[in-house]
C-alpha cells in the first residue's frame, strides 16, 4: 500500500513539472522575443531563415523557433543580408494580431496550424555557434524553412490578409 502511494506521488509530480514547462513555453511565446535573419534563397515559395529564440531551457527555445519563424514572416518580415533581399511582413496592418486574436491564438497554440508551414532544415541539431548563453537564458539559432506561398494563400482564404492583387482594379 505504501509503495502505491509513493508511486502515485511520483506520477503526480512528473505531471505537474511537465505542465509547468508547457506554461513556461506559452509565456515565452506570448512575449514574441526572437530575431530573424535570412540564410539563403529557399525553394520556390519558401524562405530559408535563421530564427534566434530566447529561453531558459534549450529544448523550449528550439521548439519555439518554429512558432517564431511563422510569426516573423506574417507580422515582422526581415531585413536583407547574405545576398537575400529584404522581405516585408505578409500582414500590412501592424495591429492585425490583436484585431484577429480569435484566429491567431489557436493558430499559434502548441501544435497549432502554424506547424503546417514550417520545418527545421538541419534535423533539429543546434551547432555550437548557434547556442549562446545570455545572462540566465539561452539564445538558440535554428535554420528553418517557411512555406510562404502556402501560408499566404491560407491567410488570404481565411480573410486575415488581402490578396496580392486586391489593390488593383481590372480594366
Question: Model-derived features: where do they sit?
Answer:
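Bacterial N-terminal signal peptides that target proteins for export
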Residues: 1-8
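Domain-level marker for long, solvent-exposed, non-transmembrane regions
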Residues: 19-171
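Bacterial N-terminal signal peptides
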Residues: 8-15
Amino acid at each position: 500500500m505504501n509503495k502505491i502511494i509513493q508511486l502515485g506521488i511520483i506520477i503526480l509530480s512528473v505531471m505537474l513539472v511537465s505542465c509547468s514547462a508547457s506554461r513556461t513555453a506559452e509565456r515565452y511565446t506570448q512575449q514574441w522575443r526572437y530575431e530573424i535573419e535570412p540564410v539563403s534563397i529557399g525553394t520556390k515559395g519558401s524562405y530559408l531563415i535563421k530564427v534566434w529564440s530566447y529561453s531558459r531551457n534549450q529544448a523550449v527555445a528550439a521548439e519555439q523557433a518554429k512558432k517564431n519563424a511563422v510569426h516573423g514572416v506574417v507580422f515582422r518580415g526581415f531585413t536583407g543580408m547574405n545576398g537575400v533581399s529584404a522581405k516585408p511582413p505578409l500582414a500590412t496592418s501592424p495591429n492585425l494580431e490583436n484585431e484577429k486574436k480569435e484566429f491567431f491564438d489557436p493558430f499559434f497554440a502548441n501544435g497549432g496550424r502554424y506547424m503546417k508551414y514550417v520545418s527545421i532544415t538541419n534535423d533539429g541539431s543546434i551547432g555550437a555557434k548557434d547556442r549562446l548563453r545570455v545572462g540566465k537564458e539561452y539564445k538558440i539559432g535554428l535554420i528553418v524553412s517557411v512555406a510562404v506561398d502556402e501560408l499566404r494563400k491560407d491567410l488570404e482564404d481565411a480573410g486575415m490578409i488581402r490578396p496580392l492583387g486586391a489593390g488593383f482594379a481590372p480594366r
